[in-house]
Curated annotation (Swiss-Prot):
The lineage of its organism: Eukaryota, Metazoa, Chordata, Craniata, Vertebrata. GO terms for biological process: adult feeding behavior; epigenetic programming in the zygotic pronuclei; generation of precursor metabolites and energy; hormone-mediated signaling pathway; melanin biosynthetic process; melanosome organization; melanosome transport; positive regulation of melanin biosynthetic process. InterPro entries: Agouti, Agouti_dom, Agouti_dom_sf. SMART domains: Agouti. The presence of a 'disulfide through disulfide knot' structurally defines this protein as a knottin. Residues 1-22 form the signal peptide. Glycans are attached at N39. Involved in the regulation of melanogenesis. The binding of ASP to MC1R precludes alpha-MSH initiated signaling and thus blocks production of cAMP, leading to a down-regulation of eumelanogenesis (brown/black pigment) and thus increasing synthesis of pheomelanin (yellow/red pigment). It comes from the Eukaryota. This is Agouti-signaling protein. Residues 63-79 have a biased composition (Basic and acidic residues). One of its GO terms (molecular function) is type 3 melanocortin receptor binding.
Length: 132
């Protein structure tokens, strides 16, 4: 009985090892130094050289000015969008296609009615007849 358990445990370990080894990508299956040299994907000659350039004061000032212009243009654009006032509703009512759960007031449109679905969990004001 102990021999069969030992044999099954050894078989299980080998199966786990071979399963993990079979899922490795081909680049990671290196056998010797020659294959390591031939399969190396990192070549230092392939990368371009990096040069570091110091910025002078004039270029810094130009970039700051450009940044300030961009900021001011963004602020002006946002101010234009905000400037439109919304028309306030005259009475406390629910607009068409908005949520109108039972504690909410009635629908604003006289032709609309509150329709509920999914056991009154999703309610909205809808126009039922076009001839109203």
């Amino acid at each position: 009985m102990d021999v069969t358990r030992l044999l099954l445990a050894t078989l299980l370990v080998f199966l786990c090892f071979f399963t993990a080894y079979s899922h490795l990508p081909p680049e990671e299956k290196l056998r010797d130094d020659r294959s390591l040299r031939s399969n190396s994907s990192v070549n230092l000659l392939d990368f371009p050289s990096v040069s570091i350039v110091a910025l002078n004061k004039k270029s810094k000032q130009i970039s700051r000015k450009e940044a300030e212009k961009k900021r001011s243009s963004k602020k002006e654009a946002s101010m234009k969008k905000v400037a439109r006032p919304r028309t306030p509703l005259s009475a406390p009512c629910v607009a068409t296609r908005d949520s109108c759960k039972p504690p909410a007031p009635a629908c604003c449109d006289p032709c609309a009615s509150c329709q509920c679905r999914f056991f009154r969990s999703a309610c909205s004001c809808r126009v039922l007849s076009l001839n109203c």
